[in-house]
Structures are given as C-alpha cells and as structure tokens.
Amino acid sequence: MSSGIVLLIVAIVLVVIIAYLIAIIIRKRNDSLITKLEERKQNLFDLPVNDEIEEVKKLHLIGQSQTTFREWNQKWVDLSLNSFSDIENHIFEAENLNDTFNFIRAHSQINNIESQLNLAEEDIKAIREALAVLKEQEEKNSARVLHALEMYESLQASIEEGDSNFGITMPEIEKQLKNIEAEFSQFVTLNSSGDPVEASEILDRAEEHTIALGQMTEKIPAIVAKLEDDFPDQLDDLESGYRRLLEENYHFPEKNIEERFQEVREAIGNNSNELVSLDLDKAESENEAIQEKIDSLYDIFEREIRAHKNIVKSKKIIPAYLEHAKKNNEQLEAEIERLNHRYILNEKEELNVRDFNEEIASVEKDVLPIIENFDTQEKPFSVLEDKFDRAIKKLDLVEEGQLDVFNSLKNIENVEKTARQKLDSYINRLHAIKRFMEKRNLPGIPQDFLSVFFTTSAQLEALMDELNRARIHIETVNRMTEAATAAVENLEETAYRVVQNATLTEQLLQYSNRYRSFEPSVQESFDIALKLFETDYDYQGSFDEISYSLETVEPGVTDRFVSSYEKTRETIRF
C-alpha cells in the first residue's frame, strides 16, 4: 500500500474523529440550552398564578370588574392548557432532533421554544399585574363601601340612641336616613348590574349625604335644647321674676315688657317650626336673636334691682348728709356774723353761704318727699337712682364749698395777726436802714434813695392806719402787706447799692492817685467823679466814671476792688 493511500486514510479518520467531536460538543451545548428552556418553562408553570386567581375569585367581583377578571382568567387557562403543552411538545421534539444529530432543525426548534417562552412570560406578567390591579381596586372599593356603610350605621345608631335630643326634627332626620339607605340600595343594584361608573356616583352622594346629616345631628341637639329647654326656662324665670318685682313695688321705664315676653315666646315657636326644614344656619341665627332679646330683658331687671340696692343705701345717707350740710351752714353763718363785727369781709363768702342754703333746700324739696314715701312711690328705681346720685353729688359740692369758705374765714384773724407782726418788723427794719446809712458818713444821701425811703415809710403808715380801723378790710390789709414787703426789700437793696457804690468810689479815687500825674485821662475822670461824689451825691455815676478810666490803664482793677469789698461788706443789723 502506497504511502499516499495511507495518508488519505489517516486524513479521513482524523476528519471523522473531528466531526464526531464537533457533533458531540454541539449536542451537549443544545442539551444545555434545552435544559435551561425546560427550567424556564417549569419556573413559569410554578408561578402562583392559580393562587392569585383564587384570591381574586373570593372577592366576589361584579359588573365590569367581573368581566375583566373572566377575560384574564381565560387567558391563563389558554396559556396553561395550550401554550405550555405546545412548549413541552417542542422541547421533546428538540431533544429528539438533537439526539439524532439533526442540529440545524434542533437549533431552529430551540429558537422557537425561546420565543414561545418569552411570549408566555410577557402574558403571565400581564395576567398577574391585571389580577393585582383588580385585587387592589376591589379592596379599595370594598373598604370604601365598608367605610360608608359603617359611617351610616354609626350615624343611625347615634340618632336612635339620642332620639330625644332631636325634638321636632326627628321625622325629617328619619326621612333623610331612609333616603341615604335607598341610595346604598341603588348603589348595590347598579354595581351588580355592571354599571360601576353610575354606582360610584351614587356611592359618592350617599357618603356626602351621610356626612352632611352627621354634621347636622351634631348641631341639632344644642339648637333643640335652647328652643325646648333653655329659652322656655329663661322666659319662665323672667316672667315669674317680673311678677315678683311688681309685687315689691318695682316700676319700669319700659312699658312694653309683657309684649316683649310674647315676642320671645312667638320667636321660639316660629324657630321650632322652621327647624323642621333643617336650615341650621338660619335656626342658629334666630336662636342668637332670641337670646339677645332674653338678655335685654335680664339687663332691664338687673338694672332696676341694682338701682334698688343703691337707692336703699342712698336714702339712708341723704337725710344725714342734709343735716350735716345744714349744720355746717349754720356754723358758717355764725362765724361770718362774729367776724363782721371786726372785719369787712368779702361778699363772696356770704353769697356762697346763701347759695349753699339754696342747694340744700333744693335737695330737700326734690329728694326728701321720695324718701319719706318710698314704699308707695311709682317711679322706676333707675330714675330715682339718677336723682339720688345727683343729690349726693350736689351735697358733695356744697361740702367742698363750705370747707373752702371755712378755711377762708379761719385765715382772716391769722391774716391780721401776721400783718401786725410784719408791720412791726418792717418799722424796725426801716429804722435800722436809716441808722445804717447815717453811720456811713456820706457827703449826702442820693435823691433816689430818699424817694424809696419815704415811699416805703408812707406804705407802712398806710398799713398801720388800716390795721387801726374799727373794722378792718381784710383784703386791703393783704394787698398792703404784700406792697409793704416789696417796698422794704427794695429799700434794703437800694441802701446796699448806695453804700457799695460810695465805698468803692472812695477806694478807686484814692487808687487813681498813682496814675493822675502821668495819665491826663485819669486826672480828668478823677475831677468829674469827685464832683459827682461830693456835690451831686451821684455815687453810681461817680463809680462808673472813675472805674472806666482806671480800666483803660489797668484792666481788671475794678473787679479786684469789687471782689474784695463783697468779702468784707457790712450787713444791716435789724
């Protein structure tokens, strides 16, 4: 056998071996793919879709929800019965093709199975999502329906439990309860017949009506309590109180109280009748108006009761206050009469006392008859309270005026005593000032000082004459004492000023000697100042002349002399 043939045989054997190995590899790879597809199919088949379907079935779906559920359930049935069987057959066929090394058809079958599984996965995902949505929606709807029913049943129970609190509104409340119940029945009918949209609208209305009625039933008891209990009780209290006050001799400025009672009673009845319609805003507004009418009646009675208490106190105070005022006036009249012997008084005091008598008489005339006949009088106590208050205020003013007059009279004798003491003091001061001036040994007394001195002396003599009269005019004494005080103080200041100017002028004239020989202006001023000092007795002018001249040659010299003088100035001894 030639080597060529051998090589050909070897090559053929190698090709066969390689082909076989490749076939084995492809087969194993396909086996692996088929196994994975089998696992995917089994995983899909093992999903709890049946359990989820059973859970949704237990919800007892109705209407459109039930139709939708049936569609998705049928889709699952088709998928589980047909699609999975078809996939199983294709897998079996792919295994046979692979085992018989029909790799091309096996590969095609594997691709086909994978596509079927992808579609099955998508369908199962859609089915499960749809079931979840149906379950969630149904649970929400069930919870909503359950909540609405529970709310209605709770409202119904609370109304039945407190039916006595709703009074005349009970028939209308029961009517609205029946209407709500009818709406729930209509909801069930529509929902069962497959009309979920309209059923939902009916449920919305039933919920709204339940909530609205619940809110009403929360307000109604308070409104009914006022109309059936509070207002009638208050009105009975007012009417019985009114009768009792009339028996106790109370009178009222308001003449329509009985009519106002009737108005309140009618308003209560009208609001009770209108409450049947359950217009609670209007009922509450009417209740507020009724309460205001009742409160206004209470205010009237309380005003008169309060006035009566005040009057009882005032009718005890006023007679004693009148006696006190009259006694004060008598004392004032006696004091004025006593003082008139010695003093000429201001007519104002006597006029005031006469005015006091008139005010007292006016109060006696206006108030005492009422107090004396208090148990039979026919005026409202509030009117009498105002009259009594005015009387007490009038007596308060009288007493204040009496105190003013009393203090004024009490001060009259002190005024005279003080005036005499001041007069004696001023006369002594006048003599002391005169001695003070004489001791200065001045060339002469300035005319302005003499004018002030004689004016002061004349004022003191006039005050003395007034005090020596048989009847002293006390106001004149007051004015003259004030004038004398000012005159003496002015005289004292004038004396100090004259002596200071004279003393300082003498000192400056002596001091100017050091400048006269070489300062012509100082010599000239010296001559003028000396003439003013010794001849004219114009000490102020002389001081001004010499001080001005010295300041031109020695600034500050005048202040130095003035400061030294003020430290050693002699005072007038009184």
UniProtKB/Swiss-Prot annotation:
It is found in: Cell membrane. Pfam families: EzrA. It is a single-pass membrane protein. Residues 27-574 are cytoplasmic. GO terms for cellular component: plasma membrane; septin ring. Residues 1-7 are extracellular. Keywords: Cell cycle, Cell division, Cell membrane, Coiled coil, Membrane, Septation, Transmembrane, Transmembrane helix. The chain crosses the membrane at residues 8-26. One of its GO terms (biological process) is septin ring assembly. Residues 102-141, 255-368, 409-495 form a coiled coil. InterPro entries: EzrA. Belongs to the EzrA family. Negative regulator of FtsZ ring formation; modulates the frequency and position of FtsZ ring formation. Inhibits FtsZ ring formation at polar sites. Interacts either with FtsZ or with one of its binding partners to promote depolymerization. NCBIfam families: PRK04778.1-1, PRK04778.1-4. This is Septation ring formation regulator EzrA. It comes from Streptococcus mutans serotype c (strain ATCC 700610 / UA159). The gene is ezrA.
